[in-house]
Amino acid sequence: PSLSFFQESSEEYQIPKLSLLQNIHSSTKNILSDDALNENARMLENVLDDYGVKGEILSVKPGPVVTLYELEPAAGLKANRVISLADDIARSMSALATRVSTIPGRSVIGIELPNDIREKVLLREILSSRAYGDSNYQLPLALGKNIGGEPVVANLARMPHLLIAGTTGSGKSVGINTMILSLLYKLSPDQCKLIMIDPKMLELSVYDGIPHLLSPVVTDPKKAVIALKWAVAEMEERYRKMSKMGVRNIESFNLRVKEAIKNNENFTRTVQIGFDENTGEPKFEEQSIKPEYLPFI
């Protein structure tokens, strides 16, 4: 089998509109009043006191799924003493589960209790946030919200590898689609190209035909091997280009290309044009080539 590649499109890419995504105001919000949060904090202090744990709840940070209570333990109280009470705290607070852990760099202990109503974290809300819109990440991924309800955006370009795992129905496909849309809402096809391999033929078929694809969504395992071999060859070719340019990454390479285009410069490459008739030695010549940006793949 052979792998077919799309031809470059001359049409100008338009970033999708956020209005295509579900509206923020249509989702269920879990908004607790300050009085309710303070009441829960006092109740938690009483529960801890019943188990002989003295301390004070300094702050309460409600998130979309859990609420974080920051406990300042009394002097001499070991953190392991509080951590070992996680199951008892959950039972006393009528919660399904409780997570208790120390907070690095601080003297407080974090106690996470699940909210009665889980708030939906919508992609539109993350993509419209400053954390995503103002980020200078090359490949931004909208991952959701942290425990404090703040948007979490990661840079795929800084990840050597990314493994997504989980049980059936845990949200792996939703996570992958969220990451793909994060790239499509930020980068044009000239900046980012995608190779999608989907042996199940169900997960990624909706993306067939988008301009970012180097080839149609690969569903044949044999063609998947060809696609991966092509990616390795392309990687090695890019290493050679960057080595010749004296740069270490795609971002630096594209900056060099930008300068060359601005100064009307051309790059050169050495190609073999044949063999010398007398000596049989290979003959080379320098060819001038137009500088072109390297998209992320």
Q: What residue spans do the PLM features occupy?
A:
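Low-complexity, intrinsically disordered P/S/T-rich segments
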Residues: P1-V153, R158-H161
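P-loop NTPase catalytic phosphate-binding loop
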Residues: S9-P16, I103-V108, E112, A131-K262, ...
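Catalytic-site microenvironment of enzymes
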Residues: E265
